[in-house]
């Protein structure tokens, strides 16, 4: 569930998009019933010929998971961002990471009760994100970490990606009774159960001890094989 403030922002974005479309200002928007990633239509010149391609953008925030399990939280932040344009049948080829931390130089003794030290979060998150990106073969062209005292309350961990695919290779059909469903995913264990709701429930100073297992452990060596299914 979203917080009230976040929900209001989301509603305003949807209303804004509808207004822009009604004014004819989003002619390049790829409209579909799928909810995977922001998708636009762009002309691409290949060997002297112009083709229509779909370019897809997606970002993922893993503030809470990274706060309690830095390595896994940041790793699956990138993995989750890759998942959606991949579901849209596009090949993800570039990433961006924007994060926020309190001062990582603060002595461990000054760590707030129920929190990990800022240095532990910052270093662990950087290692987790880069580990996933290196193993799945995705270049991150922009990395920016902001430092502010307010981030001591909650870490900011944002991963964003961009993917693309020839428009004529993306088939969109409605499912019907009797269709065969194939599930693809990286190998994982029991970790991650409850992770989707973890950021919305009330936490205490003891949450750090019990919620680490809710953060999914990604498996990029397995996942990389099905990213190749979308290669143009």
Feature-to-residue mapping (PLM):
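Mobile "lid/hinge" segments at catalytic clefts and subdomain interfaces of large enzymes
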Residues: 36-43, 51-229
